């Protein structure tokens, strides 16, 4: 009966013919909220899967997070996670093995091609705040802020970045949102309110 009800609601939304309106079940809504919260419990490592080979590689360990602190590096190839061979396994499944309750640990084996060596890590999970803002001061006191996505944590990170650049004597600002997949409208509104208070 619940599936029938969900399908009715989905049908209503589809009938609107609006690309920005849709219905989510509780199971579909949970990962969506996690993806836009900007925080999760895990080890703070971005991984990517090659479509052809299915090899999963570390793209970027977040600075100051457990994965980086353990010694994981960009380019490391995942071999095993939590005792499971990851060969041919979908990346979303592997990520679900890596994530877990803060304070628990996960065993990860990687192959580092540049050294032709295998490394074993036992990494303690903790709450990770995803860094969605990077910034620097360019020549002529021009501040540069890159925003990679609009999550719950982004507006605070953006305001902190702009405040720091102002303290350094910023006279102009470039906000780079290229390749930003989007996210929360409320975050964008908060950022614009800060930039354009009137």
Regions found by a protein language model. Give the residues of each.
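Residue-level recognition of conserved structural "scaffold" positions that shape functional pockets
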Residues: 49-51, 78, 190
